[in-house]
Amino acid sequence: HRWNQKTVFYEEASKVPFIMSYNNGKQLKSEVFVQSGIDVLPTICDFAGIPIPATSKGKSLASAFTQINQVPNRDYIVVSDQLSQGAPVNGQQLNPEGRMLRNKQFKYWIYNYGTQTEVLYDIVNDPGEMVNLINDPNYTTALKNCRAQLFSWATEYKDPFIKYLVN
């Protein structure tokens, strides 16, 4: 996509493998499932046998690696992005921030700044994320569902970005 940074929501930058090594004398397994960075701390705490902080928003994934048929089932994940810029551009300090929701078929993202703040991709039929469907009337229901899921997530996790979301 010719972006000069890795803080974007395209698959090449946001679909990062989560690799964990844990040696407790048991044979662990390899699993493919969707997880979020907010799950790392609770997972490490769980493996270490220490309490998960009450302020942690994630969920432990330890059982996915140690028990049979315990892979977490999520309808979607949310990824956040905050671009930090050093020098002002035309006298204005820009620090765009965004959220991305990815479910089984669609990827929706929204930024608080820019000329195209919302994007919707059908990642099943357009895995290269080349056609923005945000204004396509055939995808109105998908867009509403993605917006509602992201709003629900932001409400649950008390995300201050909620003020930019469309519901």
Task: Give names to the regions the model predicted.
Residues 126:
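Intrinsically disordered, low-complexity polar regions and short flexible loop motifs
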Residues 26, 39-41, 46-119, 153, ...:
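C-terminal cap/loop subdomain of S1 sulfatases and analogous C-terminal strand-loop tails that border
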Residues 9, 18, 30, 60-63, ...:
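Conserved beta-strand positions that form and line the central face of beta-propeller blades
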Residues 41, 130, 150:
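Generic structural marker for isolated residues within well-ordered, non-membrane alpha-helices
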Residues 15, 133-167:
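Long, internal low-complexity/basic segments
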Residues 1-29, 35-36:
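Histidine-centered active-site microenvironments of extracellular/periplasmic hydrolases
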Residues 5, 25-35, 47-53, 87-88, ...:
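Active-site rim elements
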